[in-house]
Amino acid sequence: MREEALESICAALSISFTEDPDHLESIIDRFSEIFKVKDHLNQLRKKCEKFQTFTLEIRPVGSSNCTENVYAYIIESETCRQLELKPTGTTKLEIGSDKNVSLKFGLSQKKDSTTSKKGLSRSASLLKKLKFSDKKNLDELKISIFPLDIAVRKNINLGSGKSTLLEMKLIRNDHRNMIQCLEFDDFLEMTRSFHEWQAQISESELYDGSLGDPTFSMFYSIAFFFEIPSFVLKLTEMTCFLVWDDEMKKLDERALADVSLKMTACESEVDLQHPLLSPALSYLNDCTCNTIRCILVPFSTEPFFPPVSPSRLKSINVALKLIADICVLDVWDEFENLANPSNFLSSELKKLLESSAERYGESLKKQEFNELCRTILNLWMSLSNESQPYYIFFHQFDINYIGAAMLKLDKYLAESIQISLKCQLDLLNLRIPTELENFTKTTMRLFVTLRNLLNMVEAFHLPECQLFHFEEWFTDISVFWTYSWREVTLQMVERTITLDEDGDSVKYGARRPLPAGLYSFLCIQKGISDDLARLEFTFPHHLVVCAASVVNIMCQNINAYARKLFSEAMRNHEEKASRLVRATNGIEQAMCFVEEGYRRFAQFQRLEEYVDVDDLSAVRSTSIRLLKSTRDTCEIQVSTLLSHFVNLKTDIVLKIAKNLCADGKESNSGLKSYMRELASSERIESILECCYGLVDDVRCLLLPNCFKLSTQHFATSLEQQIRKNIRQKQPAEYYSNIYVGFLNILIFKRLKQMYLKFQIALKYIYEFLEIEDRKDIELLSNLHLNSFSTKDLILSYYDSLCEKIDRTRFGNAPHVDVHISYVKMVDEDTISIQIKLIKMSPIEWIDVISDRVDYFVRLELFPKILFPSNKFESPTTNPMPQSTRPQWKQLFEIRVPLECFFLRGACLAISVFDHERFIDRLVGRGFISLHSVPQASEEKPTQRLQVPLLPNDFSDQNNVFYQLLKTRACRDSIAKEFIETRTRRHQRIRALQHYIRINRNRVGHMLLG
């Protein structure tokens, strides 16, 4: 230790224990032993005297004030000093550092040579004079007997019979400011010396860190003298203990704990500006860091990662307890520029953790694929179940346990897995199903484990690492998962419960019968969806491949399940009807399940989030196409099953058909004498009841779509039975009764309740026959047409002809321009039709017979059954000779009864003829429906109408009404007359064409001229 520091310590001890001289001597003696300064102790003490002096204050008391020329004599060992006292007030006598002096008082005499001196004087000769003068008999006072800082009054004999009362007080002067302050190194060395000396004299094997007496008094007196805070003192003791040399005597661990506890307790009282605090903290940091290195050396090979058991942390946690207490001191936060042991501890622990993770990563490279997969799975499980204590332990040192370890492990993990996957792909034999299945199970489990690891890593907001892109490692593998899904699910579908093991359908209660194996089938499809959802794909390649594959696999499973149900239902069995129903409903329910949930099953929501628009559109269109194809295939099988089911209901259908085809009388003819004749309404009620029963039974058995398909088969079956039982060549009333008899009877009776009942029944019948809004099936259309009267057929013929003309574009066909409108007559029972013929379009035509053309127009009302020729005239224009562009500009008026004008089928025919010698040749004919004629208006004139001229036999051969009239002509006079009229006209036209062919040569010479 520096000599200046020893001097300061000695001075501090001297001043601190000066009041107890005996104790001071023992303290100084202990000081010389501890610091080994016995050989020059006196020199040190002599140097320290300057730091402590004494002053005696003297003051006269009362009325006996000092007279002039009263002197005080301070007698030392070799010299004497004198000082004249002040008559009033306080006189101070500086004694010096040695109190072993005497004090005398006396009066000064004029003959005394010393009287001429004023103030304080000091000389050896004065001491001699004092000894031999008359003052030698004066009272002598020992300064050492005076108490410090206490006033003492004493009556002083001045000689010559004089005395005075003086009050004297001895004051000690400590010159602390002159003592050099201890530097931290000196204070640290002093502290170390105190504890080492105490440890040497201690009789126990372990040093507990407690200082004995008077060492304890010395240590704390020095600290108190130099105003060193308790916190700095404890910091210094802590640094001494941290670097303690155990070869001298081993330090008890309780010493560190005790100092740490006291250091924490007095931390709040520390003066942050104290000059020793900063160096003390700096040195403590160095010692702590060195201690941390020593503590962590035994743990350098400890496997901190992956976590195994919390017990492994117990030893290191105990070892770092004291260090942690030092690191968490609040005072570190006040000195940001100083190094902090907590940062060093964190970095060292992080190195240990990363080293452990690196060793673990190196071990992954040496493992086989299956072992690697098991290791990664165990890693995930240990992180999930055992990492919490490790996370808490490292978190207290500001270390992200999982994050730091996974960042170090990342490259090893990525390299090991990618190499292993590539090797497995190269070795995979697709011809061995078990090998493929094991490969897919292992890789899928590995994928899920990596997904879980990634989710854990993402929760700690780590920077980008290779694990974030682990899905790309499986780019060539995900397709094998779909193969495995397909094979496994197809096998599971084949093992579902058969219809033979299903039991009776009665067990389903009020629900529609379903096969018991359907639930297993639906669970299988849900399992595929769950597997896909568990993978949580974000890589577009996987999403596209697996989404399309899942839809395809489900469609294949539906086809397999449908084939299974179809083959089982088609077997001969006593409950075949029930089996057919269950199989049909099972196929339909399976299809509906996939159709309604395929977007959810195939993770379309993820597709929309991670896949671009083109790929998403491709997957969507592919899925829709697969589902449509599967639906079509299933409906074919369902249709076949339903056709067999309908065949089992033939008796009911036959009964309905026979009742529909009966004329209402023949069923009662045999019982006429015994029973009353059934009314038409009763017969209809019987038919409806039969329909009710059949429709309700089928509806309760089949799912809606299956029921709809079954109606097609029932309609076909009913049509076949009606065709077998319907009578041919019957009056229209017969067919009308079959088609609309229900409605006519109920309307004529005007029974509202029965009418509503009929509407409900008719709705079921239409549903049963799949007739929507009475639109046609073939049989119903035929019945409808045959129920028409001959008059209605003729009207329908002309109405259809007019509609077809309106809908057809005839291109360059000739036409007639007319203005047409109607006016109601005053009596309002007659309509006046006004037709103004304008012109006709140009016609390139030469009559081959007369070599000329003479066009004229005839206006006729059709049909003739409404407008007979003897009652309705046919206005005719004059022929226009030799004109291919005739213009008539004639106005005609035709009157029509009001009830006929708005009747559909009533029409006006504009016929253009070429006048001939033998017969007028029909050039063309146009038709205008009377109900389409606009009403005349003064505000808005009628527009010109172009009426196309068509051949006479236009649409006759293809018109269904014409063909029906032709068939009915053999038994109906009106139809016969209509057909014969048309036939004669066609014959005349054909005769003209025959004449032209015969005279072709003559006509040719005429043309050549």
Swiss-Prot record:
Gene3D superfamilies listed in its UniProt record: C2 domain
Annotated keywords: Exocytosis
PANTHER family hit by this protein: UNC-13-4A, ISOFORM B
The protein's name in its UniProt record: C2 domain-containing protein aex-1
Disruption phenotype: Severely constipated due to absent or weak anterior body muscle (aBOC) and intestinal contractions during the defecation cycle. Reduced uptake and accumulation of triglycerides. Locomotion defects characterized by mild body thrashing. Partially resistant to paralysis induced by acetylcholine esterase inhibitor aldicarb. Reduced enrichment of unc-13 at presynaptic active sites of neuromuscular junctions.
Every C2 domain range: 812-945
Tissue: Expressed in intestine, body wall muscles and some amphid neurons.
Protein task: Involved in retrograde signaling from post-synaptic cells to pre-synaptic neurons, probably by regulating vesicle exocytosis in post-synaptic cells. Acts in muscles, to regulate the localization of synaptic vesicle fusion protein unc-13 likely during vesicle exocytosis and thus regulate retrograde signaling at the neuromuscular junction (NMJ). Regulates anterior body muscle contractions (aBOC) and the expulsion steps during the defecation motor program (DMP). Probably by regulating DMP, plays a homeostatic role in the uptake of triglycerides. Regulates locomotion.
GO BP: defecation; egg-laying behavior; exocytosis; lipid transport involved in lipid storage; locomotion; male mating behavior; positive regulation of acetylcholine secretion, neurotransmission; positive regulation of defecation
GO cellular component: exocytic vesicle; secretory vesicle
Organism: Caenorhabditis elegans
Family label: Belongs to the unc-13 family.
Gene transcribed to yield this protein: aex-1
Segments passing through the bilayer: none
